[in-house]
Curated annotation (Swiss-Prot):
Entry-linked Pfam families: AAA_lid_4, RuvB_C, RuvB_N
Residue ranges, annotated region (Head domain (RuvB-H)): 239-316
PANTHER family in alphabetical order: HOLLIDAY JUNCTION BRANCH MIGRATION COMPLEX SUBUNIT RUVB, PTHR42848
Record's GO cellular component terms: cytoplasm; Holliday junction resolvase complex
Name of the protein in its database record: Holliday junction branch migration complex subunit RuvB
Binding site for DNA: 294, 299
Gene Ontology terms for molecular function: ATP binding; ATP hydrolysis activity; four-way junction DNA binding; four-way junction helicase activity
Domain observations: Has 3 domains, the large (RuvB-L) and small ATPase (RuvB-S) domains and the C-terminal head (RuvB-H) domain. The head domain binds DNA, while the ATPase domains jointly bind ATP, ADP or are empty depending on the state of the subunit in the translocation cycle. During a single DNA translocation step the structure of each domain remains the same, but their relative positions change.
Record flagged with keyword DNA damage: yes
Protein keywords: ATP-binding, Cytoplasm, DNA damage, DNA recombination, DNA repair, DNA-binding, Hydrolase, Nucleotide-binding
Length: 316
């Protein structure tokens, strides 16, 4: 059995303030018989943004349309989607920052007034046409909110940041997931598994599935500390759930540049990773764990980062 997404607010773990606000918005829109305001979710990948959009659709009993931002390249792409929706439908655009920048402003009137302003014909024969669309709710999700234009962000009635999950949240997610997977993982292992998840629900669910795989194949279905460690070793995971990419980054700062500040451009060139990958995928957990620091001169490994490498026997 696969782990399924939560389907209502009660089964969604964490993000309490965010959910409290969403509940109030939904209840208010029902009482006023108004379309739900547009909502923008932002935060790290795997935190539950898509799941929560689905829950909003369930709670409002409205249809949801899932779209990838990168697939919206032309005005016609937007028209094709928004011209066929029903009143109060939800349009969820994942990675909304990746919509073609040339059509973003075309979306503004659709969000504010539920219309499209079109120009039909060319030059002297051009005519302005206003096309009405049915009231809808746009829910956007992004891992790169800084790439969104301020006027675009201003058109969302609620902008919500997904905060890091705490230890208790992660243990509850594990508790729920092992029931769905029908695996016998003792509570004494919850903290250890959670510590490798980088406090991310999607990651912990993937880890549980792989632990289950190894237990079935290597240990007659029995999950103990030994098989969990074997799983993590096979996945090339280190303490705190760091990957080889994280470790190579730390090693480069420590050994390649004698623990001196290094520019992002230099790191990108040596590690052969785009700067965006370093900033959005590798550095966040290292900064959160205080294994690195950012200075005006560049990135530096911290004393805690050096201690981490020594503890993991990654430097001598």
């Amino acid at each position: 059995m696969q782990i399924t997404r939560p389907h209502n607010f009660e089964t969604f773990i964490g993000q309490k303030n965010l959910i409290s606000t969403l509940k109030a918005m939904i209840e208010s829109s029902k009482k006023q018989n108004k379309v739900l305001n547009h909502i923008l979710f932002y935060g790290m990948p795997g935190m539950g943004k898509t799941s929560l959009a689905g829950i909003i659709a369930n709670e409002t009993k409205n249809k949801i349309h899932f779209i990838q931002g990168s697939n919206l390249e032309k005005k016609s792409d937007l028209i094709n989607i928004l011209s066929v929706i029903n009143e109060n439908d939800i349009v969820f655009i994942d990675e909304i920052h990746s919509i073609n920048k040339n059509i973003i402003e075309f979306l503004y009137s659709a969000m504010e007034d539920f219309v499209f302003d079109l120009i039909i014909g060319t030059e002297s024969n051009a005519k302005a046409l206003r096309m009405k669309i049915k009231p809808f709710t746009l829910i956007g999700a992004t891992t790169k909110i800084n790439e969104m234009a301020q006027p675009f962000k201003d058109r969302f009635g609620y902008i919500a940041r997904f905060v890091s999950y705490n230890a208790e949240d992660m243990k509850q997610i594990i508790r729920n997931s092992i029931k769905l997977l029908n695996i016998n993982l003792g509570e004494e292992h919850f903290d250890f598994v959670a510590s490798y998840s980088r406090n991310t629900p999607r990651i912990v669910n993937h880890l549980l599935e792989r632990i289950n795989d190894f237990a079935i194949v290597k240990n007659a279905g029995i999950i103990d500390k030994k098989i969990i460690k074997k799983t993590f070793k096979s996945l090339d995971l280190y303490e705190y759930g760091l990957t080889k990419d994280h470790v190579e980054y730390l090693q480069l700062l420590r050994d390649g540049f004698d623990s001196k500040p290094v520019s992002l451009d230099t790191l990108s060139g040596v590690l052969i990773h785009p700067k965006e990958v370093l900033v959005n995928e590798i550095e966040p957990i290292l900064l959160y764990l205080k294994l690195i620091t950012k200075t005006s001169k560049g990135r530096m490994i911290s004393s805690k980062g050096i201690t981490y490498l020594l503890k993991e026997k990654l430097i001598w």
